[in-house]
């Protein structure tokens, strides 16, 4: 495996969205994971809430209900890394071949290195690479190792609407 360069300059990079989420008045969380991921929900208060655009788009949309506004739960690239690693998602397949969205903090070690190797081999520079590199460093510092293997449905963030428990 290749050595990963440590990214030391995160505070000087342009700020961008990592997670596009809102919480409705009844506590339900809507999460738009990618550009055309339109999510709508009828809240207990009778109002409909929606979210669209994921974190990648310059123009995202969400509900504007002045009588009962949704709470923004968006996370940006200048948030603490502890928060980013919980909400930065990557699409992949589970052991049954179903698409799942896995948070950075749950990606196995081989997957982290594989994404960086793939991007380098394809000549792709992703603004998210620096967070994958930071996750690798974070795991070294905290002695975290996630065994390589196939993901299960439980590993992913598969629902885009999370009901308050």
Ranges and model annotations:
Residues 10, 21, 97, 114, ...:
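Short, flexible coil/linker elements and helix-boundary hinge sites characteristic
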């Amino acid at each position: 495996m290749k050595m990963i360069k440590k990214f030391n300059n995160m505070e000087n990079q342009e700020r961008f969205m990592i997670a596009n989420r809102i919480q409705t008045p009844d506590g339900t969380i809507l999460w738009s994971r990618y550009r055309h991921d339109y999510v709508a929900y009828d809240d207990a208060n009778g109002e409909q809430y929606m979210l669209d655009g994921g974190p990648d788009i310059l123009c995202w949309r969400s509900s504007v209900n002045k009588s009962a506004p949704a709470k923004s739960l968006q996370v940006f690239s200048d948030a603490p890394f502890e928060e980013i690693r919980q909400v930065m998602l990557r699409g992949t397949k589970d052991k049954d071949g179903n698409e799942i969205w896995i948070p950075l903090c749950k990606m196995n070690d081989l997957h982290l290195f594989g994404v960086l190797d793939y991007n380098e081999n394809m000549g792709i520079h992703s603004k998210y690479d620096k967070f994958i590199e930071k996750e690798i460093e974070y795991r070294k510092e905290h002695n975290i190792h996630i065994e390589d293997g196939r993901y299960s449905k439980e590993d992913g963030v598969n629902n885009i609407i999370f009901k308050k428990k």
